Every structure is written in C-alpha cells, then in structure tokens.
C-alpha cells in the first residue's frame, strides 16, 4: 500500500469520527433537538403566550438544566426596572405621599420596583414676605396742585389745558407740588387764588418802628413833680399853649410798652414816675441855611436839647366822659323809586340768578357757588323775565352765534369763480361758487323738492309754491351742498330742521303773485367759504348788469341723481309780458336749458361784493335754451318785518 493511499484512508476515518460526534451532540442538545420548544408548550402556565406575567426566563433555565447532562451555573434573566413618565422620578416608597414628594432628590428615571416608586415633584409652599416701599407723599399748599415735573416751569404750572380738580392736595412721588396760576378756568368758571390774609395784622399791639441808629425820644424833665399815680403812657413834648394831658381811654392809639430790664441797659429805662415838664423860654431863631430832611412816616423825630419845641397844630385831647355825645339822626329813607330793569343784549338771556355760573354763562341746571366764587362773580345786569314777569339777571347764552361773523361782518356774499374742484360741463358751477344756494328737502318721502337762497344765519328765502301746505316738521334745509350724494367735498354741508314757514300774505296760487316764503331754521348756520348770505335789492334787473341763477335741475331733484353737480347760467332781462308777470315779478331768459335749474333759487345780479338778490325762481314757460323764466321780486318791507319779530337787525337792503 502506498503512502498516499494510507493518508486518504486516515482522513476519511477522521471525517467520519467528527460527524458521529456532532450527531451525538445534536441529539443531546435540547435547543437543537426540539425538546426545549416542546417543554415550553407542555407547561402552559409558564407559556408567555398564555400567561405573559410568569417569569418564563427562570423556567427556561430549569428546563435547560434538566435537558443537559452537565451541571453548569443556573441562567438568571436581567432585573426589571420601572421607567418613569416625563415629569416624574424615582423616590423611596415612604417619601411619596399621594403621588407627590417635596424633598430635593437626585433625578433617577429607572426605578427598582421593590424599593422605589415613580413620583412627581411638588415644591413645598413658601411664605414670601412682601415688603412694600412707602411712596413719599407731600401735602400741597392751598395755592398749589400736584402735577408731573414736566408741567412745572419756574415753580408755576405751565400746562395749557390744566384744570383745577377738587380733592385733597396730597402729592405722591414722583409728582411735585407746583403753584397754580393766578386764575384757573374750570367747568364752573374762574377760581381766583388769593392769599388767605392780604394784609396780615400783628397778633399783639406794639410801638411804632424806630431806627436802630437813634435813641427813642424822651422829654427833658426840669422839675420833679410826682404824679398822682404811676403811668406808662407816652407823654408828648411841651408846646407853647401848654395844654394839660389827661389819660384817654381809647384802644385806637398804640400804647408804649417799656422794654424788659433783662434785654435793655439801665440807662434806657423810663422812670415809672414821670415829672411834668416845665415850660422853657423860647429863644429867638436865627436864620440858617442848614437843610433839615423831613421825618419819615413811621419815625419819631429826634429830640435836640438846643432846639425849642415848635408850635403844634394838634388839637388838645379831652376826656370822653366830660364831652356830650353829638346827637345822631337816622338817615332818611329814600322814596319808593321803581327799579329800572334793563333789556338784555342779543347775546344775553334774562334768567334766574341761580342759573348763571361764576363767569356769567347760562347753565341748564341750577348752580351752587362757593363763597369765594360768589365774591368774585362776574357782575350781572338786572332784567325782567318776559315769561313770568319776575326779576332776573342777564346771562350769556353759550349757544349764541353772531348773525354776522367777524370775517363776514357787513359783507355780502360774492360769486367765487376761481374755487376748486371745478365743474365738468359748461353749465356746472365750481365748489363754493354760489355760497347762498340752499336745498329744500322733505323728510317723510326723502325727496328734494326745490331750492332756496340764504339771507341770514337762520333764514332762507324760497318760493311759496314749493313749501305752501307742507308740515313744518317735515321740511329740512341743506346748505353748502354741491355734488348730490357725495361726502368727498372739501367742506361738509349743514342740514337743519325748520322752525316756522311764513308765506307772503298776498300770495295768490292762481296767479302766482308774490310767490315768496321765509323759512326760519331751528339751528343757526355756521358761515364758511361755501355758506354765506346774499344781500337783497328790490330793484328790477338792468340790461347792463350781469345776472345769473343756479340749481341742480328738475330731473336731478326728482330722482335724487347721484353725482349731479350744481348748475349756473347767465340770464337776460325780458319784458314782463314775456312771462305774464305782474308788478311783483320780473322776467329773464336763461342761456342754458331752463329746466336745469330749480324753483326757489335766487336771481343774483352784479359782480364782486355788489351781488344782490333781485328775484326768486317761480316758474318757466317751457324747457329749452333761451326760455323765459318768471322770478318773484323780494318784498323787503315784509322781510324786514319778519326779521324784526325775531329780534334780527335790519341789514338786508343795501344801497
């Protein structure tokens, strides 16, 4: 047998031996021969699928030990830990009360279920001591108030809209006390801040002030004659007449009080027993050029021994007990003269005194004034109330508006051709070009019925055919309108109700004679550049004058056409026969379509500041260009009467 063959046989035997040994190990291993799996299925109480809570790892170890012939160390599974939810941590069982613990502990998330549990941390309640720092509070004086430092300049309140508020004058920091101005306007009027004592008086009477550089005046005694009793009164120097001085029981003259011995030297003490001075011979005065200044008002003249006392104009003083009192007769009472009551001005209203505040303005409710306000109240004029005939006071009406403002006083409205925005068509007027144009509306139907002319802040002149028969409460007047249905105009319009409507007494609906009506407004108009009154003239239009009329047109008023602009057209005077007019009307032909203008609008003639109202649009013959229109002439006498009844000045007619 060769060596190579022997090696092959030996390798084959070794291979078979290895395979036999491996087969024996397979049959003996429970994990490879299926005994482990079959044992788990046979013990259902330890099966994880049947009873998941059983510790299957320990049983697996026992089965594995029984299946193996070797006795090795028993297999133990890893210890189970509890994983806490977010916000919890592991603590001992005794430290967790009702699911919370309050002690600071290390944060552990995996808990040993035998000794620890998951618990939520809740900090213990802490008692915080609140310390409040007291804010400094100052008490302001009676003439000061508490304001911010920005509103105080040089020690005085400088706020423009400052109003004195009633209440305690306590001023917390950082505010400061600042002096109130001399007068402060409040809702009740002016409050005058005066010192409590304008002229403070001394609490105890004292001697007159004497200069500190000279000794007090004392007469030079010559003969010591004891008086009957001690006196401490001041004795004036002797005069040439030598009147006897007696004690006068009066408290009006200041009484001399000697100084205390502790504060003044012994040489300046006044003896208690003052001798009566003896008259001295009068030496002849020699002329001298020496200037002697006059004594001050509160100064006692200096006594000079070498100067003789001068004659005095002072009258001798006598005792009051020795004099008879003069007979006093009572002042005779004047005869009962009837009190004159004045008539209040146009801006004032006669009302009860308790309805006037401290500055004389009418109040809707009774006013109670303090003693200080009543002492410095604005003087009021006596008047007689027309309602009940009782006395009253003239008080200013806060709602009064002057009929002619300052910028319009005595000035008639003018035609403004250079205003903007401008019209679109040739017959369109610019904004505020015709400032006296008004519009008459009916409230119940919300319709536009006609036009009008503003002749005062509370009066509009229109056509009687337009407003005759309508309820006063159903009429509204709009001033300052230009574009219908628009609110984007440079200045707003003004809408007000109507108080009365006065139709001309000679108005005839059949002939349209005196087709005029005066509308009195409930509220006064506020004049502006687009709202102004026109002056009136009763003269007929002339051929040389430039006349024109205005309005929005019949169609625009009937349908309230949105965006319709005010129209204006020139007119030419015509004969009265062209429009069948009488003496109360005039006729004029329009350049543009006569139906593009409104009944009640003004026929204005002139230019610049001489524009006058000479007619009110009463009606047209037909629509079209060049058609004749009838205008009612203004009756100035009747209009002035209506103005006079309402206490208005007669300023309508201009010459």
Swiss-Prot record:
Residues 213-319 are annotated as: Disordered. Residues 1-24 form the signal peptide. InterPro entries: CLIP_SPH_Scar (IPR040973), Peptidase_S1_PA (IPR009003), Peptidase_S1_PA_chymotrypsin (IPR043504), Peptidase_S1A (IPR001314), Trypsin_dom (IPR001254). Residues 343-407 are annotated as: CLIP. Residues 421-644 form the Peptidase S1 domain. Disulfide bonds join 344-394, 350-383, 356-395, 450-466, 547-605, 579-587, 595-623. One of its GO terms (biological process) is proteolysis. It is found in: Secreted. Keywords: Developmental protein, Disulfide bond, Secreted, Serine protease homolog, Signal. Disruption phenotype: Embryonic lethal due to defects in the dorsal closure and germ-band retraction; these defects include undifferentiated or defective larval cuticles presenting dorsal holes and wrinkles, defective attachment of the amnioserosa to the tail end of the germ band, defective elongation of the lateral ectoderm with compromised interface between the LE cells and the amnioserosa. RNAi-mediated knockdown results in pupal lethality and scarring. One of its GO terms (cellular component) is extracellular region. Belongs to the peptidase S1 family. The CLIP domain consists of 37-55 residues which are 'knitted' together usually by 3 conserved disulfide bonds forming a clip-like compact structure. Inactive serine protease that plays a role in germ-band retraction and dorsal closure morphogenesis in embryogenesis; contributes to amnioserosa attachment and epithelial apico-basal polarity by regulating the localization of laminin LanA on the apical side of the amnioserosa epithelium. Contributes to epithelial morphogenesis probably by regulating the bsk/JNK pathway, as part of a negative-feedback loop, and by modulating the cross-talk between the Egfr, bsk/JNK and dpp signal transduction pathways. This is Inactive serine protease scarface. It comes from Drosophila melanogaster.
């Amino acid at each position: 047998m060769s060596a190579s063959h022997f090696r092959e046989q030996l390798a084959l035997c070794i291979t078979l031996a290895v395979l036999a040994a491996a087969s024996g190990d397979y049959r003996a291993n429970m994990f490879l021969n299926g005994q482990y799996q079959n044992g788990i299925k046979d013990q259902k109480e330890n099966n994880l699928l049947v009873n998941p809570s059983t510790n299957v790892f320990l049983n697996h170890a026992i089965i594995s030990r029984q299946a193996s012939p070797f006795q090795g160390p028993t297999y133990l599974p890893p210890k189970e830990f509890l994983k806490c939810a977010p916000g919890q941590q592991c603590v001992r069982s005794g430290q967790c009360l009702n699911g919370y613990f309050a002690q600071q502990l290390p944060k552990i998330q995996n808990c040993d279920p035998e000794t620890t549990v998951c618990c939520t941390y809740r900090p213990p309640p802490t008692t915080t001591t609140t310390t409040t720092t007291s804010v400094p509070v100052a008490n302001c004086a009676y003439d000061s108030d508490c304001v911010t430092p920005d509103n105080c300049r040089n020690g005085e309140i400088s706020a423009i809209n400052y109003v004195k508020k009633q209440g305690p004058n306590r001023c917390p920091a950082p505010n400061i006390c600042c002096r109130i101005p001399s007068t402060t306007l409040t809702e009740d009027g002016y409050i005058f801040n005066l010192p409590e004592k304008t002229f403070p008086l001394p609490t105890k009477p004292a001697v007159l002030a004497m200069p500190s550089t000279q000794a007090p005046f004392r007469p030079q005694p010559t003969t010591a004659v004891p008086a009957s009793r001690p006196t401490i009164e001041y004795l004036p120097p002797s005069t040439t007449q030598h009147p006897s001085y007696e004690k006068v029981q009066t408290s009006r003259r200041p009484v001399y009080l000697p100084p205390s011995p502790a504060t003044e030297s012994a040489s300046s003490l006044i003896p208690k027993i003052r001798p009566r001075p003896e008259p001295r011979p009068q030496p002849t005065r020699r002329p001298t050029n020496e200037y002697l200044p006059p004594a001050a008002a509160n100064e006692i003249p200096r006594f000079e021994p070498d100067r003789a006392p001068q004659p005095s104009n002072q009258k001798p003083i006598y005792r009051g007990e020795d004099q008879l009192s003069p007979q006093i007769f009572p002042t005779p009472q004047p005869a009962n003269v009837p009190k004159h009551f004045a008539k209040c001005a146009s801006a004032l209203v006669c009302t009860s005194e308790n309805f006037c505040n401290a500055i004389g303005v009418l109040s809707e409710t009774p006013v109670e004034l303090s003693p200080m306000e009543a002492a410095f109240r604005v003087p009021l004029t006596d008047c007689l109330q027309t309602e009940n005939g009782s006395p009253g006071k003239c008080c200013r009406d806060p709602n009064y508006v002057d009929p002619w403002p300052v910028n319009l006083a005595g000035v008639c409205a003018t035609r403004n051709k250079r205003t903007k925005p401008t019209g679109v068509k040739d017959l369109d007027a610019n904004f505020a070009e015709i400032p006296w144009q008004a519009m008459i509306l009916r409230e119940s139907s919300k319709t536009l019925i006609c036009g009008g002319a503003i002749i005062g802040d509370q009066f509009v002149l229109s056509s009687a055919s337009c407003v005759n028969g309508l309820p006063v409460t159903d009429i509204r007047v709009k001033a300052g309108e230009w574009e219908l249905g628009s609110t984007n105009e440079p200045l707003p319009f003004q809408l007000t109700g109507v108080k009365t409507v006065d139709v001309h007494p000679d108005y005839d609906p059949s002939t349209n004679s005196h087709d005029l009506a005066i509308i009195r407004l409930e509220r006064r108009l506020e004049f502006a550049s687009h709202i102004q009154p026109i002056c009136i003239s009763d003269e007929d239009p002339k051929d040389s004058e430039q006349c024109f009329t205005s309005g929005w047109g019949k169609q625009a008023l009937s349908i309230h056409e949105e965006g319709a602009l005010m129209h204006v057209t020139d007119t030419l005077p015509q004969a009265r026969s062209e429009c069948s007019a009488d003496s109360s009307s005039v006729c004029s032909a329009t350049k543009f379509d006569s139906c593009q203008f409104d009944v009640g609008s003004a026929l204005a003639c002139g230019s610049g500041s001489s524009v006058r109202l000479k007619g009110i649009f009463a009606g047209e013959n037909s629509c079209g260009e060049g058609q004749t229109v009838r205008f009612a002439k203004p009756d100035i006498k009747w209009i002035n009467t209506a103005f006079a009844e309402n206490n208005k000045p007669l300023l309508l007619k201009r010459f």
